[in-house]
Design a protein with these regions (language model features):
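Electropositive, beta-rich accessory/interaction domains or terminal extensions
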Residues: 1-123, 131, 167-192
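Short loop/turn positions at the edges of beta-strands in beta-sheet-rich folds
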Residues: 92-94, 140, 150
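Loop/turn positions that initiate beta-strands
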Residues: 101, 151, 155-157
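Active-site glycine-rich loop that binds ribose-phosphate moieties when present
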Residues: 127-134, 138-148
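Hydrophobic, well-ordered secondary-structure segments
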Residues: 142-145, 157, 172
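Short hydrophobic beta/alpha edge segments that flank linear recognition/processing sites
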Residues: 160-164
Length: 192
């Protein structure tokens, strides 16, 4: 597993229909090491802290493998790294294999997987098509939010190392499945 790109962006105002909306979803790849702090990366900020950011959503990672899927789904759409609003574009970090609670070393930082991304309407603003929100959610390709356990630096090209595997075996994808369609799955709902 490795980091392919580190992407940051500050909130900006954009036009959505007739409304002006403030969003932090626009991320750009940057070169060199970047400090990963308890609430975000240096040079990055979330716009609406009532639903975005905080310690449990300090950094958002999205796998390159999903870009391959979306390129087939949206063949006429440019998909540069950061297009999905992710801070880290990764390789090999798959929601099927990552448990909520798994911890990792990324560069000199340590993080723990906390939850999948459940997108808001601002993803639709970024893509210029509101159907992407539903398509993203039902695709089962949510990406992963991480909490920062130990601040450090991250950089494109660095490896992502598993430190410990959570014993509950609830994957990031399991959570999305419960949210989207299988909310009566007794085996998942009864985990303590």
């Amino acid at each position: 597993m490795k980091i392919l790109s580190v992407n940051v962006g500050l909130p900006r105002e954009v036009l959505s229909g007739k409304d002006i909306v403030t969003t932090g979803i626009f991320k750009e790849p940057i070169e060199g090491p970047v400090k990963l702090r308890k609430l975000n990366l240096d040079g990055d900020k979330q716009a609406d802290l009532t639903v975005h950011g905080g310690e449990d959503k300090a950094v958002y990672a999205y796998p390159k493998e999903h870009y391959d899927y979306w390129q087939l789904e949206l063949p006429n759409t440019a998909l540069p790294w950061g297009m999905f609003g992710e801070n880290l574009t990764t390789e090999g970090l798959n929601e099927d294999a990552i448990n909520i609670g798994d911890s990792f070393r990324m560069g000199s930082a340590e993080v723990v997987a906390t939850q999948p991304r459940l997108p808001c309407y601002k993803l639709g603003i970024k893509f210029g098509r509101m159907d992407i929100v539903r398509r993203f959610l039902t695709s089962g390709r949510p990406g992963i939010y991480f909490k920062v356990l130990l601040e450090g630096e991250v950089e494109a090209g660095e490896s992502i190392e598993l430190i410990s595997k959570d014993e509950n075996n609830i994957t990031v994808k399991d959570i999305v499945r419960l949210y989207v369609k299988d909310n009566k799955d007794v085996n998942l709902c009864n985990v303590r």
